[in-house]
Amino acid sequence: MAAIMIGSISVPIIGSAQCATAPIGNRVNIVAPGHMAICKPQMRSHAYYKHASQKLSEQSSRGIEVLNSFFNNDPEDAFRLTRNGMSKVKKGPNGRIILRKPKARHVFERINLEKSEKEQKGKFFNGEYDTTVTSIKGVTTSKENDLGAFSLRSPFYKRTCKKEKRRITRENIVCVDDVNNLCERILKITRDKNIPVEIIGKRRNHHTLTFKKFKGSFVGKVSLAPERSQMKHVEMSYGQFDYILQAICRITSTKHVRDEDIKPGCSGWVFSTDHALTQKYSRLPYLVIRGRDDDGIVNALEPVLFYSDVEHYSFQNEVQFFNGWRKMFDKLKPHSDHTCKVDHNNEECGEMAAVLSQAIFPVLKLSCQVCREKLSRVSFEEFKDFLSRNFMTHESEWSTLRDGVHCDNVLKLIKGAVQTTQNLKLSSDIMKLVQNHTSTHMKQIQDINKALMKGSLVTQDELDLALKQLLEMTQWFKNHMHLTGEEALKTFRNKRSNKAMINPSLLCDNQLDKNGNFIWGERGYHSKRLFKNFFEEVIPSEGYTKYIVRNFPNGTRKLAIGSLIVPLNLDRARTALLGESIEKEPLTSACISQQNENYIHSCCCVTMDDGTPMYSELKSPTKRHLVIGASGDPKYIDLPASEAERMYIAKEGYCYLNIFLAMLVNVNENEAKDFTKMIRDVLIPMLGQWPSLMDVATAAYILGVFHPETRCAELPRILVDHATQTMHVIDSYGSLTVGYHVLKAGTVNHLIQFASNDLQSEMKHYRVGGTPTQRIRLEEQLIKGIFKPKIMMQLLHDDPYILLLGMISPTILVHMYRMRHFERGIEIWIKRDHEIGKIFVILEQLTRKVALAEILVDQLDLISEASPHLLEIMNGCQDNQRAYAPALDLLTIQVEREFSNKELKTNGYPDLHQTLHDMREKNVCEAVTQFMARAKLAGKILCNRAIEAILDFYGKKFDPASKRKKARIFATICSRVLYHDPSTCEEHSRCRRAQTK
């Protein structure tokens, strides 16, 4: 039998069936103490368990920290564990259980989200958020959900029917005070924060409320219909917006606004009932400014019958236009590289905007829809034609635009875009020539001509086709024309011979001593004529420093003469082998010489195997030697015995004499005297300093005629400096400067080829010096010859191009015209060379125009205008004269300068050379005055006698008593004859005194 033990009492449990038959008696049994369970009291206190639990918790935390620190040290393991923790368990193929790992991006997003939630929760618990509860949502816990499934209903539960309550409908009554208070609070916020408020009424009645500051206080302003380009009889309904107007008046202060303050732009201002303007002009409690009429201010709340009677104070049309302008102008503005500032007023800005608008979109009114649709409906060609006709119609207005508009480039662009091809005759002539031709090149010309005929109307496809056809024609023409430019230089080779040339004079035993050295004999004695006059003695005791730098007009070159002092230190000796390189020039057309379309290799620069030019290396110096031989190893010839103990170096400008000394080696002894005398007395005065290579070659040819044995003489080494257009003849002192090109010419016969006019070569015009100094010398010679007829006649016969150098100054041209040098030049050259005679005719006509101009700028402009015609004539003349190259350079410079100045003036830039022209003209006048002062006394006497004879002849023709007329006659005659202006002539006063006696 089952029983329940309660303490020491055991109570049996009897089934329900046995309860009826069980006897009534004592059913409680007392359990003996021995059969009872012993309950021992607890010996451990609560502190023990608390301490033990803390200890276990710390051990667990410590283990977790150790584990976390282990994984945190390795970011990859930490990320992998975090990713696995976020993965989902999935059943894979073959029944395997796998993890579906999320993407790394999602893992980082979740980590950041958890971190953010943790921070937000920490802030929340720290009390950083507002404690105001905005809403409470019911949350059902899981325990409540479990209790919901457990029912407490008894078997006697009976549902009570719900009694229906009677609903009483009540009207929604809104307190007016609450609405006004709400409106007032909202309007205060919008007023303080400058927020526009939209006021919406019935139907389409809506207005925008803003607050404006006027004299330190806020004034309410509502938008009205005229601001939207609309007109209404009643612009604002008082019945719909009275409560808003009341709220506006409560939060604004308009007492300081007077009648005279109401001006255009004040449309929509709201005034309260107690304001003076409201009481004066309004029949309603409030006043909203609409405008003015004859009676005063008009209230927008009251009806108006005729709109034209009211001057509306809404924003003016100009302000509306500017708002639209600024809106789109700011959207389309470019990137700025500077800080903008206001440099032009509104009127100038309006002019520029109008010019651009009418140039691109010409209309009568921008606001007219018909004008806009008219331009939008036409085709693109018709639109271009319309723009072109508009330009021609207003041509005078476009030309009179003031400079401040700065629209020149825009107008040029538009004119070029709408301009059509006017010269259709040329296009039709081309079509006549190529029509009915089926060749490829003729079809290509047709396509190009079609594109050019359309002008600005050509499409991009047609333009691309024309360019493609032009490219194919260019390629064809390039492949079939004779290549003379840089393309031909790619295959040009001019290698130096490795074998030394044989000089018979140096191989003859009769001319060699026992040491194998050349014996000068009589040649050495007669060489003194050259050494003493045109060479400078080098004194070793004074050092070599002053001879290291070799000057020439276009630059300097360093000699290796300093290396004659040889250091005994090996490192310093190796340093002496290093040269100073100039900027190396590539192989160009200036390096070659051609004749009859064939290369003359001996007159070209030496190249390497790959076609690159051969650059000069360090040339070591020697003492008292003549060094010859351009190919192979150089040959060292001792100086004549009389000069063996001395060292000589050619004076500046006479280094070409080393070529004549090399020719002297091959001269017969009995002819050495004539050879040296011809050089000293004939050739050197003719060549002077720094002559051209062409002149030196011509002199060598002259010597070769009298002494044919010198034609096979070997030349010294000649280096070519293309940068300064200079030829350097290397003597025994070598060259410390390296990087020059090397001339292949090895004998006098090779050099003589440079004297030919048929030779096409730039190097034959190179100087042993430079062209600028040569031009200055020619200018001085020209000025000197103006007042010395014999010198001028010699110049006209030998070098007629020198008169072109007079174009540097109007003063020189006028003096040459007065002395009739142009007339003499025409008489001399009109039959000898028609082109040169034409040059003198043009110069004479030019000088007549220059003499009529009184301002220097006008005179220089006339000279510049005549330069292109003279340059064209010069290109067809022979270049065998000394002044040809300087004159050609002068004309080229003037033409290019005029072209560049024209472009600058067109673009609005000033010409800054006016001061330079004034100073140059002043210097020329001083030079002319100096040469006039040097005129010979005999010339002055003859001139004065001629003047006296002329005065005697003309004095008889007029009344002797007329002093003034004689003075005018004398002044006219002097202006034709004298060098000076009559007003400054010293003889003028003496002649006048002689006439008056």
UniProtKB/Swiss-Prot annotation:
Motif Involved in interaction with stylet and aphid transmission mapped to chain: 365-368
A GO biological-process term: symbiont-mediated suppression of host innate immune response
Residue span(s) of domain Peptidase C6: 647-769
Pfam families, per the entry: Peptidase_C6, Peptidase_S30, Potyvirid-P3
Domain Peptidase S30 residue range list: 173-313
Keyword Transport: yes
Keywords: Host cell junction, Host-virus interaction, Hydrolase, Inhibition of host innate immune response by virus, Protease, Suppressor of RNA silencing, Transport, Viral immunoevasion, Viral movement protein
Superkingdom classification of source: Viruses
Sequence motif Involved in virions binding and aphid transmission, residues: 621-623
Molecular-function GO terms, alphabetical: cysteine-type endopeptidase activity
InterPro entries per the UniProt record, alphabetical: HC-pro, HC_PRO_CPD_dom, HC_PRO_CPD_sf, Pept_S30_P1_potyvir, Potyvirid-P3
Active site, per annotation: 235, 267, 655, 728
Annotated site, Cleavage, chain positions: 313-314, 769-770
Enzyme Commission no: 3.4.21.-, 3.4.22.45
Domain remarks: The N-terminus of helper component proteinase is involved in interaction with stylets. The central part is involved in interaction with virions and the C-terminus is involved in cell-to cell movement of the virus.
Family the entry assigns: Belongs to the potyviridae P3N-PIPO polyprotein family.
Name of the protein in its database record: P3N-PIPO polyprotein
Species name: Zucchini yellow mosaic virus (strain Singapore)
Lineage of origin: Viruses, Riboviria, Orthornavirae, Pisuviricota, Stelpaviricetes
